[in-house]
Curated annotation (Swiss-Prot):
A Pfam family that the UniProt record links to this protein: Glyco_hydro_32C
GO BP annotations listed: sucrose metabolic process
Name under which the protein is recorded: Sucrose-6-phosphate hydrolase
Pathway given in the UniProt record: Glycan biosynthesis; sucrose metabolism
UniProt source species: Klebsiella pneumoniae
SMART domains membership: Glyco_32
Major location category of this protein: cytoplasm
Amino acid sequence: MSLPSRLPAILQAVMQGQPQALADSHYPQWHLAPVNGLLNDPNGFCQVAGRYHLFYQWNPLACDHTYKCWGHWSSADLLHWRHEPIALMPDEEYDRNGCYSGSAVEFEGALTLCYTGNVKFPDGGRTAWQCLATENADGTFRKLGPVLPLPEGYTGHVRDPKVWRQDGRWYMVLGAQDVQQRGKVLLFTASDLREWRLVGEIAGHDVNGLANAGYMWECPDLFPLADTHLLICCPQGLAREAQRFLNTYPAVWMAGRFDAERGIFDHGPLHELDSGFEFYAPQTMQADDGRRLLVGWMGVPDGDEMHQPTRAQGWIHQMTCVRELEWQAGTLYQRPLRELVALRGEAQGWCGQTLPLAPMELAFDLSPDSTLGLDFAGALQLTVNRDGLRLSRRGLQTAEMHHRYWRGEARRLRIFIDRSSVEIFINDGEGVMSSRFFPGYPGQLIFSGATPVAFCRWLLRPCMVE
């Protein structure tokens, strides 16, 4: 049974909130962000008939996680984006507490969304349904209803279907928590998208010898890359280490051999996907040209998000830039989308101590004994030395200083700056650090160190959103 539509309230919220958000000095110039309300996980990242689609978790009514819809952008070039109609709203009994994350595939000639319908009960319990919706001729979506109930042996925390086709069959990975409150990744298979069979657990606590791996794994994504398979996911409850897994919840990758017929993923250790303050729920897709592309949410759930100053302007959070994934010598590399060079203005050489803070790209090489400091208008500090990189900033809730680390020899940096974010690509993508910061404007980027650094910079044009 359909629930009362909240579309009129959503339209009113967008009309009232958009001018305020766009006027905010922290609203991004070339990253994707909500016109109002809260954005989180990227969903349904795909390319169909040559056009890219990026859906996203969106609460258009408030800057909190209460009313989860699927927003929708599309693009011909990953630079110029168009707002599409809202794809999903929680207006059925089986998704009444949120249309949670999922993926998109082409099925029976139509773009089809695979998502989790979240249902909460008055006694504090919950359940989850894996659901389908198919695109209509006018670009809206028609819900087909649930296709998979909660599997036996797992709590109501089963979500985020990532679906793909392989060797004539459909496969799906789901994030899950078993009844012993241990995080898992489940593998399902089907001849179509309607009747799924559980193959087994392919990753998580007590799988492949992995102990103490947290109480819930979410946002899984399993895909081939070069001569290996990679599983990306977000374990909740993973133990923090001295300089790793420091966010409330991290995003990780592991490489290994995937046997679809036997339902086995024989993988190695967990690696942090991004070492910055804000990165979560990444999703990948394979473009028509063969590239494996990734986009992530530049946020972390249950962190300092409710203290971000943009909430006062009616919006919160943004996406990362799109990244290209490559597998080289046993390491995952993330490189900035090559199309981003089209946003560059004229190249400018620079060797000095201060720059006006603005949306831009910086690139420079480092010698093995380099020591370097960058201060982002007092809101974020980067330190580079022979041990690696450290990002530092004060908490939004307290004045306590917090740090994030990347360890290794930094030989080259590419730094992408927007009005309230930075993404630092280390050694052509061997490491990445993504973080939000909220400076006062006008602000300065201040360099320090024993040796002046010569670098190239490009001011970045806006990423157009229609």
